[in-house]
Swiss-Prot record:
Superkingdom classification of source: Bacteria
GO CC terms: plasma membrane
SUPFAM superfamilies reported in the protein's UniProt record: EAL domain-like, Sensory domain-like
Protein name, as recorded: Uncharacterized EAL-domain containing protein YkuI
Gene: ykuI
Upper classification of the organism: Bacteria, Bacillati, Bacillota, Bacilli, Bacillales
A GO molecular-function annotation: cyclic-guanylate-specific phosphodiesterase activity
InterPro entries attached to this UniProt entry: Cyclic-di-GMP_PDE-like, EAL_dom, EAL_sf, Sensor-like_sf, YkuI_C
Signal sequence coordinates: none
Ranges of residues in domain EAL: 1-250
Length: 407
């Protein structure tokens, strides 16, 4: 890293770079993130390490940051009047004067022609060391001026979703650095799913950053990304781009994503239809045997479905379990009576799925999820026996893996 004193001595060589942010809706540049750079030893170097170094005095950082911002805003004065301006700020430094000096700087440029609603203030929640309530009040004050708030680096380090929800940002920036392989870990998928749910609840848009490959762009598109940023799209530059520079390319890639996703959904639907026919046939056949109890019924059904299931049970429409479990352990079916009378209505989508079965009168697969007891990625097939009784069949990962399109 460059010596901080060298940076201050050569502050005239500090300059802003701009990384374009693209819209999923219009496939065009909607704004730029302002990044700090310095010309040193005849090459452009990032100032990221300088700003992240806790040992560098605050006044040094503020001086360099102020120069970068002023140069950038002078450039935005000459650009399209609807471009969003994303600026990283250290929340700890902002709180030194409760954000007043930074706000005054933005107001100065408002007077020159940049409307305040174009500014997006990026902060990193997990780096903030002060009182989160005070930070919330400062950001709420900023928002009264129309300034947007983005919480940055989500997914890169430990982010506190409660604190993020309290800050109520306009955007959540999700870092895809952890997505370095084409098949992300289930736990990472779950974290991003939780973040997407939070975004929906608090009305925040998702911006995926650090996109460095096609599969990461596809992942961001599939997981609710409204905005995209990263080297796979464009590298940071000293100049602005034509706003439609990637429009045709993004249209082509999105079309490929849509085609792939439609095919995948059709495959799951076809598997669901075939599995429904198999279960329906088995249930109809077993009902003719007049078995003495529902527990005997699911034991017999387990034998019929032994190649594709590892747990079977029945519940009523309120989630009360009417049978025990039949559970496959070490390749053998065992009966678990202790599960009878447990209630599962608290589980996500349980009641929604009950109503869906009641109305459609058909069975269907759940999404892929992690089983609470085994930790294995599974799907559940839900089947309506009648208006009062519903059958649940858990399918193991080993079976799903063998079926095209169920993973």
């Amino acid at each position: 890293m460059l010596d901080p004193l060298d940076i201050l001595t050569n502050i005239d060589d500090v300059l802003p770079y701009y990384q374009a942010i693209f819209s999923a809706e219009e496939q065009k540049v909607v704004g730029y993130e302002v990044l700090g750079r310095i010309l040193a030893d005849s090459e452009i170097q990032s100032l990221g390490p300088f700003f992240l170094d806790a040992g560098i005095p605050e006044e040094y950082k503020l001086e360099v940051d102020n120069r970068i911002i002023r140069q950038a805003l002078d450039r935005f004065l000459e650009a399209d009047s609807d471009l969003l301006i994303f600026m990283n700020q250290d929340a700890n430094l902002l709180m030194l004067d409760h954000g007043e000096s930074f706000l005054e700087l933005l107001k100065e440029y408002e007077a020159k022609g940049i409307e305040l609603h174009r500014f997006v203030l990026e902060i990193t929640e997990h780096n903030f060391e002060g009182d989160i309530e005070q930070l919330y009040h400062m950001l709420a004050y900023y928002r009264t001026y129309g300034i947007k708030i983005a919480v940055d680096n989500i997914g890169k380090e430990s982010s506190n979703l409660d604190r993020i929800a309290l800050l109520s940002p306009d955007l959540l920036k999700i870092d895809l650095q952890a997505l370095k392989v084409s098949q992300p870990s289930p736990s990472y998928e779950h974290v991003l799913y939780s973040i997407s749910l939070l975004a929906r609840k608090i009305g925040a848009a998702l911006l995926y950053e650090d996109i460095e490959a096609n599969f990461q762009l596809q992942y961001a598109w599939r997981n609710g990304g409204r905005y995209f940023q990263g080297y796979y799209l464009v590298s940071p530059s000293e100049t602005f781009l034509e706003r439609d520079v990637l429009k045709q390319r993004l249209k082509t890639e999105f079309h490929q994503f849509i085609t792939h996703e439609k095919k995948k959904l059709e495959t799951v639907y076809e598997h669901s239809e075939q599995f429904y026919k198999r279960v329906h046939q088995a249930v109809t056949s077993l009902r003719k045997n007049n078995l003495s109890s529902d527990d005997d019924f699911i034991k017999k059904l387990a034998e019929e479905l032994t190649d594709c299931s590892f747990r079977i049970y029945m519940c009523d429409e309120e989630g009360d379990q009417l049978t025990g479990n039949v559970f496959k352990q070490d390749g053998e079916w065992i009966y678990q009576p202790e599960y009878a009378e447990k209630n599962w209505s608290w589980r996500p989508y349980f009641l929604e799925n009950i109503m869906r079965m009641r109305n459609l009168r058909k069975g269907f697969f759940s999404d892929l999820y992690s089983d609470l007891e085994t930790g294995e990625m599974i799907r559940t097939f839900s089947y309506p026996m009648d208006d009062q009784m519903y059958l649940f069949i858990d399918l193991p990962y080993s079976y799903l893996y063998e079926q095209d399109g169920l993973i």
